[in-house]
Amino acid sequence: MIALIQRVSRASVVVDNQTIGAIDKGLLVLLGVEREDNREKMEKLATKVMSYRVFSDENGKMNLNLTQAGGSLLVVSQFTLAADTGRGLRPSFSGAGTPEQALGLYEDFVAFCRAQGVTTETGQFGADMKVELINDGPVTFNLQV
């Protein structure tokens, strides 16, 4: 399971010209599900995302996690993160989870974060989305479990 996280001062997702999810300070999470992923991996990754210290403390050091910084999450499903780009000029998605598996783990990821008290907005699974963000830093990390 893969989470590409970006520290943002704001981010939003638009589907059919309507904003369906938006946050101010927080993390934009692009979430990719691979075939071997399961609930245990999902919980481990969600915990890591919420606990990862990417926000600056009073000394300007990346020392605060999402909750400590008072941030929110915007979680967007992104199957292309599971692409194999090692050969040729066209990505292969054979390692990506099935749509049913990915939807279940995506929904579980969001529910798990909300259950921890984190304000969590979402995109729309499987939709053609327009994602807008102001990357703060920029600060971007590729987390995998």
From Swiss-Prot:
The keyword Metal-binding does not apply. Gene3D superfamilies: D-tyrosyl-tRNA(Tyr) deacylase. Keywords: Cytoplasm, Hydrolase, RNA-binding, tRNA-binding. GO terms for molecular function: D-tyrosyl-tRNA(Tyr) deacylase activity; Gly-tRNA(Ala) deacylase activity; Ser(Gly)-tRNA(Ala) hydrolase activity; tRNA binding. Its EC number is 3.1.1.96. One of its GO terms (cellular component) is cytoplasm. It is found in: Cytoplasm. A motif (Gly-cisPro motif, important for rejection of L-amino acids) lies at residues 137-138. One of its GO terms (biological process) is D-amino acid catabolic process. It catalyses: glycyl-tRNA(Ala) + H2O = tRNA(Ala) + glycine + H(+); a D-aminoacyl-tRNA + H2O = a tRNA + a D-alpha-amino acid + H(+). An aminoacyl-tRNA editing enzyme that deacylates mischarged D-aminoacyl-tRNAs. Also deacylates mischarged glycyl-tRNA(Ala), protecting cells against glycine mischarging by AlaRS. Acts via tRNA-based rather than protein-based catalysis; rejects L-amino acids rather than detecting D-amino acids in the active site. By recycling D-aminoacyl-tRNA to D-amino acids and free tRNA molecules, this enzyme counteracts the toxicity associated with the formation of D-aminoacyl-tRNA entities in vivo and helps enforce protein L-homochirality. Belongs to the DTD family. Homodimer. A Gly-cisPro motif from one monomer fits into the active site of the other monomer to allow specific chiral rejection of L-amino acids. PANTHER family: D-AMINOACYL-TRNA DEACYLASE 1, D-TYROSYL-TRNA TYR DEACYLASE. This is D-aminoacyl-tRNA deacylase. It comes from Shewanella sp. (strain ANA-3).
